Structure formats: C-alpha cells, structure tokens
Amino acid sequence: MNSLDNITKSFVEQSQNILEDNLVGIYLHGSAAMGCFNIQNSDIDLLVVVHEDIPDEIKRRYMDMVVELNAYAPKKGIELSVVRKDVCNPFVYPTPFELHFSNAHLEWYEKNPSEYIDKMKGTDKDLAAHFTIVYHRGKCLCGKEIRDVFEKVRREFYYDSIWCDVKDAEEEIKENPTYVILNLCRVLAYK
C-alpha cells in the first residue's frame, strides 16, 4: 500500500468511517496536488474539514488510523490539519485547528496520546499558505468542492504565513535544503 493513490484512498475511506456526518471534505495540497510529488522528498499534505469540534475519543481513533497509515507513507510521512468549516469561509487568520499531525509529532503521540490530543489544537499561521494552495491548486479527495468550502485567502495573510515559514531560512537551509529552496521559489512564484 505504498503508492500515493492507495494511501490517500485508504485515508479517505477510514476518515469517512470515523468522522461520519461531521466530515465536510478532504483536500490534497502541496507537491502531490501540483504534480511534483517525489517519493524521496515529499510528504502527503492533507486538509480535513469538519462541521464541528471532534470529541477526544474520536480524535484518538482518528490519530490511531493516521499513525497506522503513516507507516506506509513516504519517509516524510503524512502531514495533516483538521479544521472546522466555519474558519474556512470567512477565512480566519491565524487559523484555528482541531488537530494536526506530521512525522515531527509522531514520537509525542506514541508516548502520550492523551496529552497529544489534549494539547494539539490552537492556531497556526501556516494554514493560510495551505489554504491558498488548496484554493488555487488543491484536489478534492471527497466531500464538498473546494470553492464551496474555502474562501480565497487575502494576500497579506498569505505573505505573513509564508514569511513565518521562511524567516529562518538562512539557518534551516543547512538542515533541509530542498524544502527551504522550494519554499523560497514558491514565494517568488506567487508574486
């Protein structure tokens, strides 16, 4: 099950089973949506939109599913944020999120899932960049169409979001040159 299509298909099916009627849609963004996915360097970027807050016991089931699927993902893994529909349109910045996951958080979840679920919520300026990519280049994997869920993100929010992501590029380029260089190119391309 290591292909992008198989992983996203399984993710959608299991998300529908766990989130049921609360699920608005699942949206692919990043390199996989823009046709430049590289199994060696890319993660699988997903935005999951729900109608209302997710109870902790459902978050636990959901996270267990994500972690299980993440084992089959490329080495950079799955990165996802779960947001409520009411922060997508009208767009709220910084954007509140219900849940977030990436490989950077895997160890924390595995060591203390209850703490992770309790604390992994808040706001994230980076979501403005993700919403922008979804709006312009994203793919709807299931649920409502992109333009029916997302409002176009204002330029100043997008620029603030990407600035927050690249402001430490001079140092971070040593650790993750591909990511930083591609992010800087994305900034220039958007102008």
Each model region followed by its residue ranges:
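Active-site oxyanion-binding pockets that recognize sulfate/phosphate
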Residues: 1, 52, 170, 174
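Helical scaffold of the NTase/Pol beta-like nucleotidyltransferase catalytic core
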Residues: 1-27, 57-58
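A short N-terminal beta->alpha junction/helix N-cap motif
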Residues: 3, 49-53, 184
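Short, well-ordered alpha-helical packing segments
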Residues: 12, 16, 63-70
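Short, structurally constrained coil/turn elements
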Residues: 19-20, 40, 74
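Catalytic metal-binding acidic patch
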Residues: 28-64, 77-84
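Conserved NTP/Mg2+-binding pocket subregion across the NTase superfamily
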Residues: 67-174, 181, 187
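Short helix-capping/linker segments at secondary-structure and domain boundaries
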Residues: 189-191
